[in-house]
Amino acid sequence: MSDFTEQTLRQKLANLSNHSNSIQTTSSWLLKNHNNREIIIRVWLKTVRKENKGAKVVNLLYVANDVAQNARKACPQFKDDFFPAIESAFRHCCELKAKEVENAIGKLIHVWKERQIYSQSQCKRLQEAHQQMKLSGSFPSPAGRNNGKNSQPNQFIVEEAKKNAQDVLVSLKRLQNPPSTERDIRIQLSKYPDNISCPEKLQSVQNSEEAKALLTQNEEALPMLEDYVKRLKEETKERESLETNLNMLIQNVRMSIEHHEKLCRDVKRKEDRIKADLLEVEKTFESLPDLTAEMPNAPLPTLEALFQKRK
């Protein structure tokens, strides 16, 4: 196994194939380097977003699946940290409109739900993304703008955007007074001597009394510090969730805008055609003889004159 570098990671993801050996080998390498999971997840998601071939995206999703399933014992945190990226990748797949990707996502959700890889609520969120992918065909895509078919408004996207907006508002409300801005606890923690947080400075302890005093201070600071760190982690997760919800909201709003812009273009085109037809009708109407006008008071031709005209 080679040492971990971001370039090596990119190369391995680029060389993925649909063979199980390729998927498993790459997955094992990722699990071995789980300490670099933040880089792995970031590069994996970026690779998925840049890929426009359905088969390549499926391979990347299968690698994530193998990592998530095998990380339960090796590194559970890897599996949990991977979820926001997986959800974001599922949302991105809506733009591909590839049947093979849609089928692969459906299978993965079923497996994760059945084997309890992810929780019921997490699987539900993934199912919503999958459903959004199924229904995204109702919206115009860059490749199909001129297909001449009128797509119908998708109520699901509207509801999804509303839900995203509500989630964003909830996250923003929770982050109004985050732990990272709590000045009092920072001041309180800073009052403790450096000895309790820096093992190198323990050499300055001269006797048992100083050691006991230091231990007492350590016991006082530890619960406070653990609680603060816990709340900071929760804040970090909340910020990650906010970022995910914002990305989802932007995507849904863009899809909705694209749909309504096409709808406006279609209506304008029909309006122009109706106006042109109306002008043509008016022009034809004006050229018709006026049947209400008085007929000229001229004598009718005689039978003899009619027969002469026929000859």
Swiss-Prot record:
The keyword Transmembrane helix does not apply. PROSITE patterns: CID. Gene3D superfamilies: 1.25.40.90, 6.10.250.2560. Residues 224-256 form a coiled coil. It comes from the Eukaryota. SUPFAM superfamilies: ENTH/VHS domain. InterPro entries: CID_dom, ENTH_VHS, RPRD1A/B_C. Residues 1-134 form the CID domain. CDD domains: CID_RPRD1. Keywords: Coiled coil. PANTHER family: CID DOMAIN-CONTAINING PROTEIN-RELATED, CYCLIN-DEPENDENT KINASE INHIBITOR-RELATED PROTEIN. This is CID domain-containing protein 1. The gene is cids-1.
